[in-house]
């Protein structure tokens, strides 16, 4: 639904569903226009043009409380079928001999993708403490598939499994079975934390709050930085040694 054609398609899709009420967790005038033209009578949305002033957690909590009279915590939980988790554990041999680590290698843009060499260096370091298996998560686009291929072609290829072309229904129980996640600030960091997996989030170019709102999240910042935000451009300064130190602490290695 990108561009003018995408907007028109989205309006058409919404009209077909005859929604009577909408809640828009965004300050964009584009979404305000879309929901109006879709014929939705009751439209609730964040205040327009106030994105820079917003705390993503508190703004959402207040919005939900005001319009739905519900109090929500900032520690989201994603529940999946326990039988599916156990089946996956058996299918992919999640045994205790190994430490099972999800690597969130992708990102919504190039400034959020920490160079893959830094992930490989972390893999080298953590593998000196315990045998590890790595589960490689990224998008299906050619750029991110190339990143996955670089990891698979490293010295760790025998202990890697790509999740790149799996359905989400197959991916979630795999992530749930992991002992740790190390991820760029991408959807996989939010998913793994919500599944209850301790997650190290590599913060390079977005507000720190995106990577520490959950008790399951441990942020790693660019060297020399005590905070990050939009346009911090810190991906080259993420230190694999720091990831390793925090991973050892979380895993009690």
Please name every model-derived segment.
Residues 1-253:
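Catalytic machinery of carbohydrate-active enzymes
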């Amino acid at each position: 639904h990108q561009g003018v054609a995408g907007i028109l398609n989205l309006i058409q899709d919404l009209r077909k569903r005859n929604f009577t009420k909408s809640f828009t967790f965004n300050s964009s005038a584009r979404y305000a226009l879309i929901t109006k033209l879709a014929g939705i009578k009751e439209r609730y949305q964040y205040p327009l043009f106030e994105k820079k002033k917003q705390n993503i957690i508190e703004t959402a909590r207040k919005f939900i409380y005001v319009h739905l009279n519900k109090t929500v915590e900032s520690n989201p939980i994603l529940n999946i079928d326990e039988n599916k988790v156990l089946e996956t554990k058996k299918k992919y041999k999640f045994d205790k001999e190994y430490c099972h680590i999800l690597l969130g290698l992708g990102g919504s843009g190039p400034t959020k993708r920490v160079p893959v060499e830094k992930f490989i260096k972390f893999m080298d370091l953590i593998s000196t403490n315990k045998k590890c298996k790595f589960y490689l998560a990224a998008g299906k686009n050619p750029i991110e598939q190339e990143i996955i291929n670089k990891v698979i072609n490293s010295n760790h290829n025998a202990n890697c499994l790509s999740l790149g072309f799996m359905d989400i229904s197959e991916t979630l129980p795999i992530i749930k079975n992991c002992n740790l996640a190390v991820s760029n600030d991408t959807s996989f960091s939010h998913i793994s934390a919500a599944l209850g997996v301790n997650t190290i989030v590599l913060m390079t170019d977005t507000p720190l709050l995106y990577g520490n709102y959950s008790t399951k999240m441990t942020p790693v910042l660019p060297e020399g930085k005590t905070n990050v935000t939009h346009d911090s451009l810190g991906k080259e300064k993420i230190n694999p040694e720091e990831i390793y130190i925090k991973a050892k602490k979380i895993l009690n290695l």
